[in-house]
Amino acid sequence: NLRKAKIEKIIAQFEFDPLLEIKAKHLSGGQKKKLVISMALINDPKILLLDEPFAALDILTIKMLQNIIVSLQSIDKITVIVCDHQARDLLSCVDRAIVLSNGKIIASGSPSEIIKDSTAKSEYFGDEFKIN
């Protein structure tokens, strides 16, 4: 059954095995966030919109989510649109980005182009910004 295979893939991808018997109300904030994202993937979307997916997550969960985003884009061929204020976390897992300031685009391009952009540096990142 394709649906069962999809669910099993998501369980493995999001490392849900130890959590399968726990009710959602007892999950941590990061676990709940992963659950919501995984639920969006059940119906094989062509586009996935994530609003501040890295907010309030520990570093291990951020890294796992970054890897999932990269995998969704490269392997599953899903367009992932991420809106986030955490530039370092965001630029570590996307191939293109747009930087807004006061509702206007101030930079657009690959992560390496974005961090070199003088307007993005002065208004958003600062001179010492680096991607991990």
Predicted regions: what is each one?
Residues K23-L27:
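Conserved ABC ATPase signature
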Residues L48-D51:
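Catalytic Walker B motif of ABC-type/P-loop ATPase nucleotide-binding domains
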Residues D44:
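Conserved catalytic motifs of ABC-family nucleotide-binding domains
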Residues I37:
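Hydrophobic anchor residue at the start of the ABC signature
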Residues K63-I75:
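Helical segment within the ABC ATPase nucleotide-binding domain
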Residues L2-L19, V70:
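Conserved ABC ATPase "signature" region
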